[in-house]
C-alpha cells in the first residue's frame, strides 16, 4: 500500500502546485486548513518552499536551483537583495546577524525566514534574472551537480557543461517525471579531480576512456545507487556502461530516471531511495531492463576510468593535485578563477552584494558555487588578480584559509531544520576560531575536513569527512544537552569509504577538545607526508579512538541547551513575537 505522502503526491504534485501555493499566499498563511498543512507542505517542497521547524510554523525556507552551481551575471545580486529585503527574522543570530544566504553542498542557495505571503513577489524578482526554485526539494530530481569550473578547467578530460545544461532544460523540466519515489540526485563531471562526487549520487557520470574500433575515445562511465543518510550510506555501483556522446549519455541517465520512477519503492519511504532500489534489483538486472525497455541502442561495457587521478576529498597529499577550488587557479582561456572560503557556507546579504560587485568589477560577473559551500569568482584577467585579492571582502572570506576553515562543512541544524538534533552553524563558526587559535596543524597539511550534520540524514556529508560529526543529545550533570557522535577516516576519491564512528554522544562542549586530541595525535604519530585519512587507515579505528579524548576546554559553548525544546536556539522568549498581520521585511 502506498504511503500517505504518495497518496498526497498522486493527487497533486509538480508544476500544478504553484497555482495553489500562490493562492494560499494571497489569502495568507492562516488560509491553509490546519488539518491539511502536512499535505500542502509536502507539495510545496517541489517548488523549493519548506516550512521551518516547530515554533517557526509561519516561516519558510526557499531553496534555489542552479545546475552545476552556475550563477550568471546579476543573479547573485538579485538573490542577495531578496535576502536583504525578505529573509530577516524576529531574532538575530549571534554569529551572523540577520539576512543571509546559505550555500549548500549541492551547489545551490537557501534563504530563510521567508513568509508565505511574500513568496510570489520573491519568485517574480528571482525569475526576472533566470533564477528558479522549481524542483529544489521533495521527491523529485534535485539540483544537478558537477565540476563548478566545467568548461574552464585546464585539465578537463570531457566537456560536461552542454550535457548538464540539457539535463536541466529537458530532464528536470519534464513534469511527467516530477513525482519520484524519493529525492533523486544526479552528478556529471568531466574533470580529473572527481569533484562532483559521483560515488554518493543516485546516478553519476564520471570521465573515462575506451578503445572503440582501434581508436581511444573519451566519454563517461555510469554509476548508480549512491547516497548518504540514515546510517545506511552506499557507494554508487558501476553499471558497466560507457557512453561516448552527449545524446547517449542523456538517454542513459533519462532511462535510469524513468526506470526508478516506474519501479522504485513507493510503499515504504525508508526503503525508497535509489540506493535500496539498486540493492534489490542489482546492476545486471537494471542494465538489462534499460536495454530492453528504455533505450533503443545496445549499451557498451564500461571504459577505463581515471579515478586513480581523483584528488577531491580523496585523502591524498596536496602534491597530488587540488582537493577543492579554493585559491587562485588558471582557466583554460588564460584567465583565472578565485575560490573563496566562506566559513560554514553562510554569507550575509551585504557580503553577497559586495561579492557580486567584485565579480562584475574584476571578472565577467559570473559566480560558481562548489560542493563545499564556497563561491568562485570567474574569468579574472591576470592583471586584475592583485587588486581583487587586496579587496577587504577577501580578508574575511579568504582564498587562503587555515586548514580547519578550508575543510569544514556544516548543515542547517536546529536553527531551522525540524530533523536536526543540534545547532550547527554558529557552534561550528566558534569552534573554527578556537581550533585555529589553539591547535597546531603540520605545515604540509592544508586541509582537515570536519563535516557536521545535525542529524543522521547527513546533509553535511559527515560520512565522507576526515572527522565526521552527527548531532545527538546526551545527559550531562543531570541535564539534557546537545552532543555529537564522532567518526574518522571518511572520503571519496579512488576508493570511497565512510567514517568509522569511534565515540558516541559526546557533549558538545567536549567536542573541540576531542578534535584537538585527534589532530595532536595525528601530528605526533603520522609518517612523513601522510594525510589524516591515510593515518586513520594505517592506525585503525580502535587505535584512533584511544587517541580521541573528549574533554572540556576553555572553548565557550553557550548553546548547550536542548534547542529542540525551544522555538529558536538563540531566543530568550518561549515563542516568536506575535503580529497582527504578516511581518514586513526591513
From Swiss-Prot:
Co-factor requirement: siroheme; [4Fe-4S] cluster
Thermal dependence of catalysis: Optimum temperature is 60 degrees Celsius.
Cofactor annotation comment: Binds 1 siroheme per subunit. Binds 1 [4Fe-4S] cluster per subunit.
Description of what induces expression: Repressed by the presence of ammonium as nitrogen source.
Description of pH dependence: Optimum pH is 7.5 at 60 degrees Celsius. At 40 degrees Celsius (temperature of the natural environment for H.mediterranei) the optimum pH is 6.5.
List of residues binding siroheme: 459
InterPro entries assigned: NIR_SIR_4Fe-4S, NiRdtase/SiRdtase_haem-b_fer, Nit/Sulf_reduc_fer-like_dom_sf, NO2/SO3_Rdtase_4Fe4S_dom, NO2/SO3_Rdtase_4Fe4S_sf, NO2/SO3_Rdtase_FeS/sirohaem_BS
Entry-linked Pfam families: NIR_SIR (PF01077), NIR_SIR_ferr (PF03460)
Pathway: Nitrogen metabolism; nitrate reduction (assimilation)
Enzyme class name: oxidoreductase
UniProt keyword terms in alphabetical order: 4Fe-4S, Electron transport, Heme, Iron, Iron-sulfur, Metal-binding, Nitrate assimilation, Oxidoreductase, Transport
Activity regulation note: Inhibited by cyanide and azide.
Single Gene Ontology MF annotation: 4 iron, 4 sulfur cluster binding
Region spans: Disordered: 566-586
Chain positions recorded as [4Fe-4S] cluster binding sites: 411, 417, 455, 459
Further details from the record: Enzyme stability and activity depend upon the salt concentration.
SUBUNIT field: Monomer.
Annotated PANTHER family: FERREDOXIN--NITRITE REDUCTASE, CHLOROPLASTIC
Family: Belongs to the nitrite and sulfite reductase 4Fe-4S domain family.
Name this protein carries in UniProt: Assimilatory ferredoxin-dependent nitrite reductase
Species name: Haloferax mediterranei (strain ATCC 33500 / DSM 1411 / JCM 8866 / NBRC 14739 / NCIMB 2177 / R-4) (Halobacterium mediterranei)
